[in-house]
């Protein structure tokens, strides 16, 4: 939940005054990543100048650069890292020439982006959501208890601001990194298909399925915890309504709700976009296969014609009679021109008439709930109706019952923003999700 206390002109003037700049060609970035990797293996988090030179030597060898000027180039690279505030240098008068180097927050942030944040972990996300859920519950309990301004700052505002908001930002960063990974997968698939699409089919399928699985796993984890998180945020928001001096808490809760909604919404939208891309790739592969078949046949036919005098051949072809479709798509199921007139005893009653009669009966029966002001549980009512009809009519009957029920009134629980529980309505797996109608 980033907030800037300075204005844009102040930030620009500050950056210009301090001469901030970052320039990291691929070899310098590789050197920084090597330093971060070696630094992570040390307990004290410190590196000497000799260790930095050794790391630079590895990078120089990987880029096939000359080793004659390794000392000068390593010294220039280290000084450049210090100037760009990627490394901090600490010198001592007792040990002159043996400086100690530590990565700055900027250096850690850049290397963390390229190294640690590249891996998606469901366990890590689950732990983050578990921590957020615990913090939100404690904050909601503290909000329900109430107290003075110090109580709200210490037990409600602080956990939301410095724990929940930062974890939400971390999850948002994970989503943005996965956006980049999707683009990288698309580039890899495009390169595979441009080289040899036959050999690339299995690799493309693997990349598509892995990315789809990762996106779905992330979204399922978010949706499973999203309702509980929103419920606790609503508890805090309800507790602040009676206090005019807690606008800072209310504004923070609103920002967190928007952030959570945006995270879950973009997760689903990202899945939908990836499904569209998946279909596009499969359509391209199918088209390529069809075109390649025609191309191979044309090439073989051309070679056969060119070598006819050396290897004569005969062409046999078959031209079967075309099968005509005798079905009239516009013909009604029981058109009088086809079936003739039926006796009155065999007249078929159209489904629309049956539906109107059934709707009238159900409307009359459901009106009892409104007259008595009794709560109407759609799950139980629909299940009772479906038990009276064959399975083939369950969908139509359930739709009629629900249409008539929602005309009678609304459920006050709908205004809380919490989803209703799924209730089974028949023995074949059908379920309905609806609050009890209690306001007519």
From Swiss-Prot:
Domain of life, source organism: Bacteria
Methyltransferase keyword on record: no
Protein location: Cytoplasm, Nucleoid
Chain residue ranges for the region called Leucine-zipper: 208-236
GO annotation terms (biological process): cell division; chromosome condensation; chromosome segregation; DNA replication
Keyword field contains Calcium: yes
Major localisation: cytoplasm
GO MF annotations in UniProt: calcium ion binding
UniProt KW keywords: Calcium, Cell cycle, Cell division, Chromosome partition, Cytoplasm, DNA condensation
GO cellular component: cytoplasm; nucleoid
Record-linked Pfam families: KicB, MukF_C, MukF_M
NCBIfam families reported in the protein's UniProt record: PRK05260.1 (NF003615)
Subunit structure: Interacts, and probably forms a ternary complex, with MukE and MukB via its C-terminal region. The complex formation is stimulated by calcium or magnesium. It is required for an interaction between MukE and MukB.
Family: Belongs to the MukF family.
Task performed by this protein: Involved in chromosome condensation, segregation and cell cycle progression. May participate in facilitating chromosome segregation by condensation DNA from both sides of a centrally located replisome during cell division. Not required for mini-F plasmid partitioning. Probably acts via its interaction with MukB and MukE. Overexpression results in anucleate cells. It has a calcium binding activity.
Protein name: Chromosome partition protein MukF
Organism annotation: Citrobacter koseri (strain ATCC BAA-895 / CDC 4225-83 / SGSC4696)
Source taxonomy: Bacteria, Pseudomonadati, Pseudomonadota, Gammaproteobacteria, Enterobacterales
Gene: mukF
